[in-house]
A protein has these predicted regions:
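Charged docking surfaces used in two-component/phosphorelay signaling
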Residues: 66, 155-329
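N-terminal Rossmann-like NAD(P) cofactor-binding subdomain of oxidoreductases
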Residues: 1-183, 218-220, 284-285, 289-295, ...
Length: 329
């Protein structure tokens, strides 16, 4: 199968190539696409070199599938053009996520919503994906009423420039800044732009996407998202109120049996999820599982995942695998 990766030279695009290879996705020919400044560069995939081309030429090459990770403006302009040419697009930007005509998919939760007619499929926000993968089995059993999430997010979510800024600051080297402030030895309580309601766009992504993925507009969600000087993955402190009471042992059992979830929760041995351990893993790690002592039917969780993998590239490839396995691609 011919597969295009739009944004192939970025952090997520590079990870998409890695994940496609690792999971043995049937790529007969890779079509790497990037911006003007990357045209003519070569990327290596499965031992072969491929030249980076522009989006127009990629459409002419007639791939069956295009994985997009080149930002919202690129997706808004080019995804419909790819789709019009009969190419299935899985888009990692926020461009199509809340479009009522587009599916927002986390395969462990709502892959059954997909159909052969879906030409543009949205990949959710990284911080949303890991949270809903962990919470969905609990929602099925106890019905979530309210979620309060605080995130501790990796600089890799911003991109190459942010990683470079962090590494430069650690070495005491001056360079281009991805953030308005230093990130090393710091925590920046702003991810994306502030909106009129006082929340950031990232925070509202978590609010709105959670409801759409879990197909339940009654769930109340509030979030505070924070960038921290970490590279391995995103961490989240999540407080969840349910309609029904629960037993902690049953919660652990449900999470242990959930697809894509690994429970790491042994406080006595100082065992809990950390971004360093989640790095280059596809699972969502859950720990610090405990009842909220201040409110009935309420649980605290600590959720960690590699935002470039399950939070982006792996989730997109899993969507493609589902389409392929069900004769939709």
């Amino acid at each position: 199968m011919k597969v295009a990766v739009v944004g192939a030279t970025g952090l997520v695009g590079t990870k998409m190539l890695q994940v496609l290879s690792e999971r043995n996705f049937p790529v007969s020919e890779l079509i790497p696409v990037a911006s003007e400044r990357s045209l003519g560069k070569e990327v290596i995939f499965n031992g072969k070199k491929y030249k980076v081309i522009n989006a127009a030429d990629a459409i002419k090459a007639k791939p069956a599938l295009a994985l997009f990770s080149a930002g919202g403006s690129t997706s808004l302009e080019w995804a419909p053009k790819f789709a019009a040419a009969g190419i299935t697009v899985i888009d990692n930007s926020s461009a199509w996520r809340m479009d009522p005509t587009k599916k927002l998919i986390v395969p462990e939760i709502n892959a059954d919503a997909l159909s052969k007619e879906d030409r543009i499929i949205a990949n959710p926000n990284c911080s949303t994906i890991q949270m809903v993968v962990a919470l969905n089995p609990l929602h099925k059993k106890y019905q979530i009423r309210r979620i309060v999430a605080s995130t501790y997010q990796s600089v890799t979510g911003t991109g190459v420039k942010a990683v470079t800024q962090l590494l430069n600051e650690r070495k005491g080297v001056e360079g281009e800044m991805a953030y308005k402030y230093p990130i090393d030895l710091n925590a920046i309580p702003q991810i994306d732009v502030f909106l009129e309601n006082g929340y950031t766009k990232e925070e509202m992504k978590m609010v709105n996407e959670t409801k759409k993925i879990m197909r339940d507009d009654s769930i109340r969600v509030t979030a505070t998202t924070v960038r921290i000087p970490v590279i391995g993955g995103h961490s989240e402190s999540v407080n969840v109120e349910f309609a029904r009471d629960f037993e902690e042992t049953e919660v652990r059992d449900l999470l242990s049996q959930a697809p894509g979830v690994i429970v790491v929760d042994d406080p006595g041995s100082a065992k809990y999820p950390m971004p360093k351990d989640a790095h280059e893993r596809d699972e969502v790690f859950v720990g610090r599982i405990r009842r909220d002592q201040t409110q009935a039917n309420t649980l605290n969780l600590w959720i960690v995942s590699d935002n470039l993998r399950k939070g982006a590239a792996t989730n997109a490839v899993q969507i493609a695998e589902y389409l392929l396995g069900n004769g939709m691609l």
